[in-house]
């Protein structure tokens, strides 16, 4: 089961080495620290960090943040231990370290081209890592919310981000499962696959949710949030008529405390709702 979910943006601004004295930055960092600390306090047996990357892969658990891409001198200021990680995973690993977490962790990057079905299957696999799994999702919204945004100003961005925020605030992540991948690409939503991994990991409704930060500095929508536990599957109204007999479902046996990385084959997901791109 999922004990809790922390959502933080994979923003370079979180790295102290890359920022100046902008007053927005400390507020964002504090919000991410609070969310990560709440995740650690949920007593997970393992924490999975998920974020966008150039390829879909599991990275070494001892990997650390590396800032060499931002300048040769910054590379020498990166974390001294472990293999270099993609920026989103490196920032997530640092958040866990600074929150005092020393338990098992899994670092999973997701390629931007992964289809929704594969992302949700990946999320479903993550929830089976252990009896108590924490999830740190490094993701963000559109990058088209102002004239100085990376994607300039797009009038569709505000509505897109409102759907993201509404799903998280309400604790029902169903809208994330049918996210319009094409629209997300046009709005430069780098975290689209990570959102859909989250949707696969949390098929039920969150027990409690709290938004710690919501803003769009520099034209990019950042959301920092905490989702606690699960109430169970969202119930759908049954169709009238006689109930058909169904075969019993088999479950894999697993020893308590096992932490494994299961295979992640793609599965078909019914798309009964769509985000509008126009």
Please identify what each model-predicted range represents:
Residues 168-214:
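Polyanion-binding loop/helix "lid" in catalytic or ligand-binding cores
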Residues 1-87:
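A short aromatic-anchored loop/beta-hairpin motif
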Residues 1-2, 228-278:
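Actinobacteria-biased recognition of intrinsically disordered, low-complexity terminal regions
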Residues 115-162:
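Active-site beta-strand/loop microenvironment that shapes enzyme catalytic pockets
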Residues 77-124:
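Cap/lid and interdomain-hinge subdomains that line or gate substrate/regulatory clefts
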Residues 200-241:
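Long, Lys/Arg- and hydrophobic-enriched amphipathic alpha-helices
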Residues 151-179:
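Metal-dependent phosphoesterases centered on the DNase I-like endonuclease/exonuclease/phosphatase
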């Amino acid at each position: 089961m999922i004990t809790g979910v922390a959502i933080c943006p994979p923003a370079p601004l979180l790295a102290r080495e890359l920022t100046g004295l902008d007053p927005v930055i400390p507020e964002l960092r504090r919000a991410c620290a609070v969310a990560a600390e709440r995740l650690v306090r949920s007593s997970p047996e393992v924490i999975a960090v998920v974020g966008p990357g150039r390829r879909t892969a599991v990275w070494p658990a001892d990997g650390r943040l590396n800032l060499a891409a931002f300048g040769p001198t910054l590379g020498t200021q990166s974390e001294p231990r472990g293999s270099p990680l993609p920026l989103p995973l490196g920032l997530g690993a640092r958040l866990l370290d600074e929150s005092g977490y020393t338990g098992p962790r899994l670092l999973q990057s997701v390629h931007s081209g992964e289809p929704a079905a594969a992302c949700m299957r990946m999320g479903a696999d993550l929830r089976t890592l252990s009896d108590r799994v924490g999830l740190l999702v490094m993701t963000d919204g559109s990058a088209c919310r102002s004239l100085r945004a990376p994607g300039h100003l797009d009038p569709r961005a505000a509505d897109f981000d409102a759907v993201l925020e509404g799903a998280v605030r309400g604790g029902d992540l169903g809208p994330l499962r049918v996210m319009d991948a094409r629209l997300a690409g046009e709005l430069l939503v780098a975290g689209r696959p990570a959102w859909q991994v989250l949707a696969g990991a949390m098929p039920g409704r969150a027990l409690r949710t709290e938004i710690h930060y919501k803003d769009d500095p520099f034209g990019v929508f950042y959301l920092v949030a905490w989702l606690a536990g699960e109430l169970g599957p969202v119930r759908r109204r049954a169709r009238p008529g006689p109930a058909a007999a169904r075969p019993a479902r088999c479950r894999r046996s697993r020893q308590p405390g096992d932490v494994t990385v299961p295979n992640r084959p793609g599965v078909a997901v019914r798309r009964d709702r769509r985000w509008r791109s126009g």
